[in-house]
Amino acid sequence: MRKTKIVCTIGPASESEEMIEKLINAGMNVARLNFSHGSHEEHKGRIDTIRKVAKRLDKIVAILLDTKGPEIRTHNMKDGIIELERGNEVIVSMNEVEGTPEKFSVTYENLINDVQVGSYILLDDGLIELQVKDIDHAKKEVKCDILNSGELKNKKGVNLPGVRVSLPGITEKDAEDIRFGIKENVDFIAASFVRRPSDVLEIREILEEQKANISVFPKIENQEGIDNIEEILEVSDGLMVARGDMGVEIPPEKVPMVQKDLIRQCNKLGKPVITATQMLDSMQRNPRATRAEASDVANAIYDGTDAVMLSGETAAGLYPEEAVKTMRNIAVSAEAAQDYKKLLSDRTKLVETSLVNAIGISVAHTALNLNVKAIVAATESGSTARTISKYRPHSDIIAVTPSEETARQCSIVWGVQPVVKKGRKSTDALLNNAVATAVETGRVTNGDLIIITAGVPTGETGTTNMMKIHLVGDEIANGQGIGRGSVVGTTLVAETVKDLEGKDLSDKVIVTNSIDETFVPYVEKALGLITEENGITSPSAIVGLEKGIPTVVGVEKAVKNISNNVLVTIDAAQGKIFEGYANVL
C-alpha cells in the first residue's frame, strides 16, 4: 500500500467526471480547489462531481479549499502589458492608475508604510526586481530603481521579501469562501499567506461560529511565517509547505533547508504536512517528469512529508493522469527504500513522551518486531491513527471509524487507509468489527498477524490506551499445547494405526484419539500431532516433547470435528489449531 498521500488540484483539465475517475484510480487522495480562481458555482459543480465519482468508485476522497489569501497584486496596465527596462526608474503608486513604464499601482495601499529605502519589491514571481529609492508619503508614491528588465502584465503578484507587512489575516473574500466551504462540508482549509497565529485564529473563529469541524492547514510562504512557525503550529491542524511564493520571499537556496525544518516540526507534533508547488512542473507540458523532479518528490518523502501536491500539473496541464501515476510510482519506490527500523528509532527520539504516544510507540515497535501485516486502529476522531502514523511503521494502518468525516480527514495522513464502518459500543464488538473490516479491505487475510489499537471505554475521543495482538483466521479447535513450536500441514485423520500404514507423512498432521507405542514410528515422520487424550503426562504429550513435534492434546472430538486432508496450522504455544496458513508467533 502506498503510504504517502497525493493531493491534486482540480481545474479545467481535470474537472470532468471521466478525468476525476482517472485521477482517483491513479492515486488521488485529496482534491484541492484553488479559490484564487473560479466562482462558487464553478467550485460547487466540482465538489459535486468529485463526490459523485468517489461514491461510485467506493473510494474516500477528501476536499481541500485553498483560500486566495491577503495577497498583493498590480492593477491593470495600458494595453494589458508594459515593458520595464533595467537602469530606469519607475513609480509604484498607492492610488489606482493605468500602468505605464513610468508608473503603475498596486492593490495594497499600506505598502508605502511597510517598505523603506533599500527594500526590494519583486513582481510576477520575482521575474522583475525593483529597489526602493525614495518614498513620497504626500503623493502616496514609492520611487524605485529597476534592477532587471521584463514585461509586466495585468494583476501580477507582488512580493516584499524581508518586509513585515500589515496585511489582514484573511480578506472578506476569504471569509465568504470559508463560509461556502462550511456549507459544502469540505474537509480541509489551506490558508494562504499565513504570517502569524492570529491569521489562523481568524479562520477558526468563523469555523466555531458555524460549529464546523474542518481542519486548518496554514500555508507557509514568507519569512514572517517561517519565523512564527512554532506559534502557528500550536493553533493549526497541519501545514502546507508552499514553496512557490516562499522561493520568491526568501533566497531559493534556503528553501530546501526551510522545507526540511518545517516538515520536522510537524513530524514532532504528529501533525500532517503537505509539500507543494512545482513538484512535477514540467509535466504540464511533457508526458515524463525530469530527473530533478523525481528526486524532489522522493526527497520530500524522505524528509517526512505526509502528502505531496500537484498544482498546474492536474489543474491545467496536458497530462493530469500521467502526473498522478508518476507521483504514485515515485512515492512507492521511495517508501520501499526506507529503513523503517532507523525511521522508528529517529521518531521515538523526536516525539515527546506522553500516555497516548507511549501506546503509539509500543504499537510501532511491536509491528516492526513481529512483522505484522497491518495495524487496525478503531477510532472516533482519527487521533489513534494519527498517533501511530507519526512513528512511520512499515505495516499498513487501517483506520476503522464510524464517521465519514473522520475517514476523509484521515485521507491526508501518511500510511493510513480509512474505512467507514458503523459499530457497537462494547469493547468485544469493537474488536470484532475492526478485524472484520480489515479483512474486507483485502489488506489482510486469514493467517495474518495484526495489531488492534483503540481507546477503551469506546465512544470517547482522545483515549487511545489499548493494544492487542491478533491472529486473523478461523480457529477450528484448541487444547493443551506441548512445546512452543508451530507447523503448517495437511490433516490425516487416523482412527487406528492402520490408517497411517503406507502413507507419505512428510507433510501431514496426524489427528487421532490417542496413541501407543505402535504410533511412534509414524508420528516421528509427521509434521505435527493432534489428539483427544488429555494431560502433559499422556503418551501423545510425551512423544511430542521427546520428538520435538508441535502437538496439541485434549482436543475435544478431534477425530469427528477435524476433516481429513485439510490444511491447518498448529500453534503449540497457545494450544490452538487454525484452518489454513496462520502467521503464528
Curated annotation (Swiss-Prot):
Coiled coil: none annotated. Mg(2+) binds at residues 221, 245. Its EC number is 2.7.1.40. Keywords: ATP-binding, Glycolysis, Kinase, Magnesium, Metal-binding, Nucleotide-binding, Potassium, Pyruvate, Transferase. Its cofactor is Mg(2+); K(+). ATP binds at residues 34-37, 73, 156. The keyword Metal-binding applies. One of its GO terms (molecular function) is kinase activity. K(+) binds at residues 34, 36, 66-67. It catalyses: pyruvate + ATP = phosphoenolpyruvate + ADP + H(+). Substrate binds at residues 32, 244-245, 277. Pfam families: PEP-utilizers (PF00391), PK (PF00224), PK_C (PF02887). The keyword Magnesium applies. InterPro entries: PEP-util_enz_mobile_dom, Phosphohistidine_dom_sf, Pyr_Knase, Pyrv/PenolPyrv_kinase-like_dom, Pyrv_kinase-like_dom_sf, Pyrv_Knase-like_insert_dom_sf, Pyrv_Knase_brl, Pyrv_Knase_C. Pathway: Carbohydrate degradation; glycolysis; pyruvate from D-glyceraldehyde 3-phosphate: step 5/5. Belongs to the pyruvate kinase family. This is Pyruvate kinase. The gene is pyk.
